Amino acid sequence: TTVRLHTGDPCIYGAIREQMDILDEKNIAYDYCPGVSAFCGAASALNLEYTLPDISQSVIITRMEGRTPVPSKESIQSFAAHQATMVVFLSTGMLEELSRRLIEGGYTADTPAAIVYKATWPEQKTFVCTVGTLAKTAAENNITKTALMIIGDTVAADRKSVV
């Protein structure tokens, strides 16, 4: 028996489909065991709920284009127009551009945001900020990768202030 252990849930940015296709082609049996995605762990780390009445009833999970392209119809700007809670994976090194696109799409610079570094790991760190201060917050805390960003009013629903 061989195990391919993946952090989080392999159905979100886990390349699991490509791996299962190869196993299927070779007629190799396998089991797919779900995990807990970092976006769920991040909500727990921040004691927040992604969907709140009168604030947001939708969660958008996306990423900036990197090694893997993102279809143009799934641009950050088009998703930002919905003003729903947004979770952005795999984009920590592009936070200035992420902020620009979020604002271009309709969020304001003072929209609440958070950066969660290594969600659910022992070295987990959380930073509540705004769309306009994402890059500055990451730089001040030496966060360059392995983080996700949460955007939207649910981030500050029960918080007194954001930086």
Describe every region a protein language model picked out.
Residues T1-T2, A15, S58, G66, ...:
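A contiguous loop/helix-start segment that scaffolds small-molecule binding in enzyme catalytic cores
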Residues T7-H82, P122-V128:
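Class I SAM-dependent methyltransferase SAM-binding "motif I" and its flanking Rossmann-like core
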